[in-house]
Amino acid sequence: MSWPITQHAGVLRTEVFDGLLKACLLCRGKTVDAEKINNYILEIGILTANVRADSNQVDAWRDYQQILSEFGLIYSTRINKLLTLTPIAMAYLNNVLSYPELITLQLLRYQYPNGHKSQLSPSLIKSYGANFNFESFTAFQTYHKIQLRPAVLIWKILYKLWECGEHPILSLDEMQSYVVRCTGMSDCFDCAKWIIDSRHGDVYLTPMVRARRNMADWIKLLSQTLLFSTNEDYNTIALSSYSIKERDSVNFVCDRLSEPHSFWSYKEGNYKENWFDFYGNYEENIAYILKESV
């Protein structure tokens, strides 16, 4: 098991979100004019030019647009050639949501399986050999009954550690050895117990080597939310002061987002587009918004 997520976690900040979304407005409802968007991104100075070796052309948009599709702010341009912003992106642009509120909401709702991270890795296919017959990573995870929201899971594990009198902090090694092994939301309690036992020398699981990069990216992303704090090296994650102060409200949201019926369900056909319909929805997710000022 691994949790694939954008590899651009390190550049995520308010200015980047604002700049990329405003760049989208230049081509909203139209085919992407990459040159126009790239020039705008360079002009406002939010990201590097990213000159491609094969063409010697600036292509910041091609490299960074996945940040927006990853978090349900635009439909992936692979499935919709017209640049389409989702309702949740418009709520942000209309100042209904602040950046911390938006990123907290979307990371709490981010789930596996989903319709965006659908590409199969060659190593996964190879590991199953001739018996592998899945057309997408989404179908593969669905078949194996994966149903997971990493941000919610991590919060609940940290909260359980806090309730048990343990230090409410997870190291990257603990994420890699224990947390990533979870396949469902109910695993959070067993996972917390494994971690507590390991801290007292009673159990030790070998780290899942291939998961380390994804775990590190998740820690970086979660540092942008209201709920978590990290150290400067992004190799530990802890509950933020907001999480402790507002623990009843956060726990309520996390409990609701742990319920099976709250998850998007994979169905063959237009599952990729259906994912963006679900994940980019605003009105049906207002109840999950944790306000920055309370």
Task: For every predicted segment, state its role.
Residues 1-294:
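Donor-sugar nucleotide-binding helix/loop cap in glycosyltransferases
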